[in-house]
Design a protein with these regions (language model features):
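Cytosolic-facing regulatory segments adjacent to core modules
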Residues: 95-106, 112-155
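Conserved catalytic-core segment of NTP-binding enzymes
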Residues: 135, 141-142, 146, 151-227, ...
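Extreme N-terminal, non-catalytic leader segments
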Residues: 1-32
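Short loop/turn segments at strand-loop or loop-helix junctions that form parts
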Residues: 63, 113-119, 229-233
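Phosphate-binding loop that captures ATP/GTP phosphates
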Residues: 53, 57-112
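Walker A/P-loop phosphate-binding motif and the immediately C-terminal alpha-helix
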Residues: 21-65, 69, 140
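C-terminal boundary of histidine-terminating zinc-finger modules
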Residues: 236-246
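A short helix-to-beta-strand connector/capping loop
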Residues: 104-113, 198-201, 224
Protein backbone atom coordinates (compact mmCIF):
# COMPACT_ATOMS: atom_id res chain seq x y z
CA UNK A 1 0.00 0.00 0.00
CA UNK A 2 1.25 3.42 -0.87
CA UNK A 3 -0.22 6.69 0.32
CA UNK A 4 2.17 8.93 -1.61
CA UNK A 5 0.42 11.45 -3.83
CA UNK A 6 2.57 10.34 -6.75
CA UNK A 7 1.88 6.67 -6.05
CA UNK A 8 -0.56 4.17 -7.52
CA UNK A 9 -3.67 6.13 -6.56
CA UNK A 10 -2.80 9.38 -8.36
CA UNK A 11 -4.11 10.01 -11.85
CA UNK A 12 -1.55 11.26 -14.31
CA UNK A 13 -2.60 14.21 -16.48
CA UNK A 14 0.59 14.36 -18.50
CA UNK A 15 0.60 12.81 -21.97
CA UNK A 16 -0.76 9.36 -22.65
CA UNK A 17 -1.70 6.99 -19.88
CA UNK A 18 1.17 4.91 -18.60
CA UNK A 19 0.86 1.69 -16.60
CA UNK A 20 1.25 2.56 -12.94
CA UNK A 21 3.87 0.74 -10.91
CA UNK A 22 3.33 0.24 -7.20
CA UNK A 23 6.13 1.79 -5.18
CA UNK A 24 6.02 0.67 -1.55
CA UNK A 25 7.67 3.80 -0.18
CA UNK A 26 5.19 4.55 2.58
CA UNK A 27 3.67 7.91 3.39
CA UNK A 28 1.27 9.71 5.72
CA UNK A 29 -2.47 9.03 5.63
CA UNK A 30 -4.92 11.24 7.54
CA UNK A 31 -8.24 9.59 8.40
CA UNK A 32 -10.92 12.25 8.82
CA UNK A 33 -14.68 12.48 8.71
CA UNK A 34 -17.93 13.42 10.33
CA UNK A 35 -18.58 12.53 13.99
CA UNK A 36 -19.36 8.86 14.47
CA UNK A 37 -18.22 7.80 11.00
CA UNK A 38 -15.68 5.27 12.29
CA UNK A 39 -12.49 7.28 11.90
CA UNK A 40 -10.61 5.67 14.79
CA UNK A 41 -11.71 2.13 13.95
CA UNK A 42 -10.64 2.62 10.33
CA UNK A 43 -7.28 4.15 11.31
CA UNK A 44 -6.59 1.32 13.76
CA UNK A 45 -7.46 -1.37 11.21
CA UNK A 46 -5.18 0.19 8.58
CA UNK A 47 -2.33 0.43 11.10
CA UNK A 48 -2.83 -3.18 12.20
CA UNK A 49 -2.92 -4.37 8.59
CA UNK A 50 0.38 -2.65 7.82
CA UNK A 51 2.06 -3.95 10.98
CA UNK A 52 0.84 -7.48 10.18
CA UNK A 53 2.76 -7.14 6.91
CA UNK A 54 5.84 -6.24 8.95
CA UNK A 55 5.75 -2.57 7.98
CA UNK A 56 6.89 -0.07 10.59
CA UNK A 57 3.93 2.20 11.29
CA UNK A 58 3.06 4.96 13.76
CA UNK A 59 -0.56 5.61 14.71
CA UNK A 60 -1.14 9.22 15.82
CA UNK A 61 -4.36 9.81 17.77
CA UNK A 62 -5.28 13.49 17.62
CA UNK A 63 -8.53 13.57 19.61
CA UNK A 64 -8.06 15.63 22.76
CA UNK A 65 -11.73 15.73 23.75
CA UNK A 66 -11.98 11.97 24.21
CA UNK A 67 -8.45 10.47 24.11
CA UNK A 68 -8.67 7.24 22.14
CA UNK A 69 -5.59 5.38 23.39
CA UNK A 70 -7.41 4.08 26.51
CA UNK A 71 -10.34 3.05 24.29
CA UNK A 72 -8.40 0.90 21.83
CA UNK A 73 -5.67 -0.62 23.98
CA UNK A 74 -5.70 -1.72 27.62
CA UNK A 75 -2.81 -0.62 29.89
CA UNK A 76 -1.48 -4.18 30.28
CA UNK A 77 -0.83 -4.34 26.52
CA UNK A 78 1.49 -1.33 26.64
CA UNK A 79 5.20 -1.52 27.38
CA UNK A 80 5.05 2.05 28.65
CA UNK A 81 2.58 4.90 29.12
CA UNK A 82 3.77 8.15 27.60
CA UNK A 83 1.73 11.09 26.41
CA UNK A 84 1.50 13.12 23.23
CA UNK A 85 1.25 16.09 25.58
CA UNK A 86 4.90 15.69 26.58
CA UNK A 87 5.86 16.37 22.97
CA UNK A 88 3.50 19.25 22.26
CA UNK A 89 4.56 20.99 25.48
CA UNK A 90 8.10 21.39 24.12
CA UNK A 91 9.09 24.66 22.46
CA UNK A 92 10.99 22.73 19.80
CA UNK A 93 10.01 19.23 18.73
CA UNK A 94 12.80 16.98 17.54
CA UNK A 95 13.11 13.35 16.53
CA UNK A 96 14.65 12.23 19.83
CA UNK A 97 11.83 13.79 21.85
CA UNK A 98 9.25 12.01 19.71
CA UNK A 99 11.00 8.64 19.99
CA UNK A 100 11.21 8.98 23.78
CA UNK A 101 7.44 9.46 24.04
CA UNK A 102 6.20 6.86 21.56
CA UNK A 103 4.08 4.15 23.17
CA UNK A 104 5.34 0.69 22.27
CA UNK A 105 3.24 -2.46 22.48
CA UNK A 106 4.11 -5.79 24.07
CA UNK A 107 2.76 -7.93 21.24
CA UNK A 108 3.73 -5.84 18.23
CA UNK A 109 7.23 -5.14 16.97
CA UNK A 110 6.13 -2.92 14.10
CA UNK A 111 3.42 -0.67 15.53
CA UNK A 112 3.81 2.29 17.89
CA UNK A 113 1.13 4.70 19.07
CA UNK A 114 1.04 8.34 20.11
CA UNK A 115 -1.88 10.05 21.85
CA UNK A 116 -3.13 11.54 25.09
CA UNK A 117 -3.53 9.32 28.13
CA UNK A 118 -6.65 8.60 30.16
CA UNK A 119 -7.86 11.69 31.99
CA UNK A 120 -5.89 14.16 29.85
CA UNK A 121 -7.44 16.85 27.68
CA UNK A 122 -6.39 19.90 25.66
CA UNK A 123 -5.96 21.90 28.87
CA UNK A 124 -3.52 19.35 30.29
CA UNK A 125 -0.80 20.78 28.05
CA UNK A 126 0.29 24.33 27.21
CA UNK A 127 -1.14 25.84 24.01
CA UNK A 128 0.86 24.79 20.95
CA UNK A 129 1.22 26.29 17.50
CA UNK A 130 1.01 25.23 13.88
CA UNK A 131 4.82 25.21 13.78
CA UNK A 132 5.00 22.63 16.58
CA UNK A 133 2.38 20.46 14.86
CA UNK A 134 4.39 20.54 11.62
CA UNK A 135 7.58 19.63 13.51
CA UNK A 136 5.78 16.66 15.07
CA UNK A 137 4.47 15.37 11.74
CA UNK A 138 7.84 15.87 10.03
CA UNK A 139 9.52 13.99 12.86
CA UNK A 140 7.09 11.07 12.57
CA UNK A 141 7.90 10.81 8.86
CA UNK A 142 11.59 10.47 9.71
CA UNK A 143 10.97 7.74 12.28
CA UNK A 144 8.61 5.42 10.37
CA UNK A 145 7.79 4.96 6.67
CA UNK A 146 4.06 4.73 7.41
CA UNK A 147 2.17 7.26 9.55
CA UNK A 148 -1.58 6.93 10.10
CA UNK A 149 -3.22 10.00 11.64
CA UNK A 150 -6.60 9.60 13.32
CA UNK A 151 -7.94 13.16 13.02
CA UNK A 152 -10.60 14.72 15.17
CA UNK A 153 -13.80 16.02 13.62
CA UNK A 154 -13.69 19.54 15.06
CA UNK A 155 -10.82 20.92 13.02
CA UNK A 156 -11.65 24.58 13.73
CA UNK A 157 -10.34 24.13 17.28
CA UNK A 158 -7.98 21.20 16.65
CA UNK A 159 -4.67 22.51 15.34
CA UNK A 160 -3.02 19.09 15.11
CA UNK A 161 -5.83 17.54 13.04
CA UNK A 162 -6.07 20.59 10.78
CA UNK A 163 -2.33 20.60 10.10
CA UNK A 164 -2.36 16.84 9.48
CA UNK A 165 -5.03 17.31 6.81
CA UNK A 166 -2.79 19.87 5.11
CA UNK A 167 0.47 17.94 5.44
CA UNK A 168 -0.67 14.35 4.79
CA UNK A 169 0.09 12.68 1.47
CA UNK A 170 -3.50 11.44 1.29
CA UNK A 171 -6.74 11.95 3.21
CA UNK A 172 -9.33 9.22 3.72
CA UNK A 173 -12.59 11.15 4.20
CA UNK A 174 -15.42 9.22 5.85
CA UNK A 175 -19.05 10.32 5.82
CA UNK A 176 -22.14 8.72 7.29
CA UNK A 177 -25.16 8.53 5.01
CA UNK A 178 -27.25 11.00 7.00
CA UNK A 179 -28.17 14.68 7.16
CA UNK A 180 -25.82 15.33 10.07
CA UNK A 181 -22.81 14.38 7.94
CA UNK A 182 -24.03 16.58 5.09
CA UNK A 183 -24.40 19.48 7.51
CA UNK A 184 -20.98 18.74 9.01
CA UNK A 185 -19.10 18.91 5.71
CA UNK A 186 -21.07 21.96 4.57
CA UNK A 187 -19.78 23.66 7.69
CA UNK A 188 -16.21 22.33 7.87
CA UNK A 189 -15.01 22.09 4.25
CA UNK A 190 -14.97 25.88 3.76
CA UNK A 191 -12.34 26.01 6.52
CA UNK A 192 -10.02 24.00 4.29
CA UNK A 193 -10.39 26.11 1.15
CA UNK A 194 -6.83 27.30 1.23
CA UNK A 195 -3.85 27.21 -1.08
CA UNK A 196 -2.34 24.45 1.05
CA UNK A 197 -5.39 22.21 0.77
CA UNK A 198 -5.16 19.76 -2.12
CA UNK A 199 -8.62 18.36 -2.81
CA UNK A 200 -7.16 15.79 -5.22
CA UNK A 201 -5.54 13.87 -2.39
CA UNK A 202 -8.90 12.97 -0.83
CA UNK A 203 -10.47 9.53 -1.07
CA UNK A 204 -14.15 9.82 -0.16
CA UNK A 205 -15.84 6.88 1.51
CA UNK A 206 -19.46 6.43 2.57
CA UNK A 207 -19.31 4.82 6.01
CA UNK A 208 -21.85 2.54 7.68
CA UNK A 209 -23.81 2.14 4.46
CA UNK A 210 -26.89 -0.10 4.60
CA UNK A 211 -29.35 -1.04 1.82
CA UNK A 212 -31.59 2.04 1.49
CA UNK A 213 -32.46 4.29 -1.49
CA UNK A 214 -31.01 7.39 0.21
CA UNK A 215 -27.82 5.56 1.13
CA UNK A 216 -27.40 4.30 -2.43
CA UNK A 217 -27.39 7.92 -3.64
CA UNK A 218 -24.74 8.74 -1.04
CA UNK A 219 -22.59 5.78 -2.03
CA UNK A 220 -22.89 6.80 -5.68
CA UNK A 221 -21.57 10.24 -4.82
CA UNK A 222 -18.62 8.99 -2.79
CA UNK A 223 -17.69 6.01 -4.94
CA UNK A 224 -16.46 3.81 -2.09
CA UNK A 225 -18.28 2.52 0.94
CA UNK A 226 -17.83 0.72 4.24
CA UNK A 227 -20.89 -1.50 4.55
CA UNK A 228 -22.45 -2.04 7.96
CA UNK A 229 -22.04 -5.70 8.86
CA UNK A 230 -21.83 -7.61 12.09
CA UNK A 231 -18.03 -7.39 11.88
CA UNK A 232 -17.94 -3.62 11.43
CA UNK A 233 -20.61 -3.11 14.08
CA UNK A 234 -18.46 -5.00 16.58
CA UNK A 235 -15.20 -3.38 15.45
CA UNK A 236 -15.19 -0.83 18.25
CA UNK A 237 -14.74 -3.67 20.73
CA UNK A 238 -11.63 -5.03 18.99
CA UNK A 239 -8.34 -4.44 20.79
CA UNK A 240 -5.55 -2.64 18.99
CA UNK A 241 -3.21 -5.59 19.56
CA UNK A 242 -4.46 -9.06 18.57
CA UNK A 243 -3.91 -11.81 21.13
CA UNK A 244 -1.45 -13.56 18.86
CA UNK A 245 0.54 -10.39 18.17
CA UNK A 246 1.72 -9.70 14.62
Amino acid sequence: MNFKKAGIFRRSSEGSEQPEVQNDSGGMLAVWGSPGSGKTVTAVKIAKMLSAKKKNVILLLCDMTAPMLPCICSPDELECERSLGNILAAARIGENLIKHNLVTLKRSNYLTVLGLLKGENEYSIPPFTEKQAIELLDGLRQIAPYVIVDCGSYIANDILSAVALMEADSVLRLANCDLKSISYFSSQLPLLKDAKWDADKQYKVAAKAVPHPTHRKCVGRYGKRITTTRETAEATAVSLVPIGGD
